[in-house]
């Protein structure tokens, strides 16, 4: 975990881009129907990954913005309601912080993605925003949860451990 402001910024950038890359690969694969083919996501191609990486360049910035403005603070506040660092296991508190941050970030980023990809770039009517957002959230939440818990957060902690040692 970061011990000062500089480390916190680096941690935030790595975590934001780890999440953006994973979620963009997932969403691009779904958009291109990869999950519907026999074998599902094992049919992923470098073309899908390349397109996702291009989108992740700017979506990572959106993740940083949302997490800095309200995602991290609200997630920490929610976690503090169920976890007391003085009494509870530190690992439990870390998991609660991650889970509560996902509870805030996934709906926020799903809304941002709906506005960017469905409304602005896709031309969907604004009155469809609530329905499209709900569908996007339902699609993204399981992936965001498991990607964060088992890939992005462990990778970020490992990378920061190596960078800050």
Located regions from the model:
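Juxtamembrane/disordered regions of integral membrane proteins
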Residues: 1-165
């Amino acid at each position: 975990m970061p011990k000062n402001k500089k480390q916190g910024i680096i941690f935030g950038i790595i975590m934001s881009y780890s999440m953006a890359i994973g979620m963009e690969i997932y969403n691009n694969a779904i958009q291109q129907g990869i999950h519907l083919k026999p074998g599902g996501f094992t049919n992923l191609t470098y073309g899908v990954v390349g397109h996702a990486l291009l989108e992740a360049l700017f979506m990572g910035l959106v993740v940083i913005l949302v997490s800095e403005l309200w995602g991290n603070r609200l997630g920490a506040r929610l976690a503090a309601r169920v976890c007391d660092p003085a009494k509870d296991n530190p690992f439990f508190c870390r998991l609660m912080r991650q889970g509560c941050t996902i509870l805030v970030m996934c709906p926020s980023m799903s809304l941002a993605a709906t506005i960017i990809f469905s409304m602005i770039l896709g031309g969907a009517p604004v009155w469809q925003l609530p329905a499209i957002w709900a569908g996007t959230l339902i699609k993204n939440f399981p992936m965001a949860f498991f990607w964060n818990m088992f890939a992005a957060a462990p990778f970020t902690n490992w990378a920061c451990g190596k960078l800050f040692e």
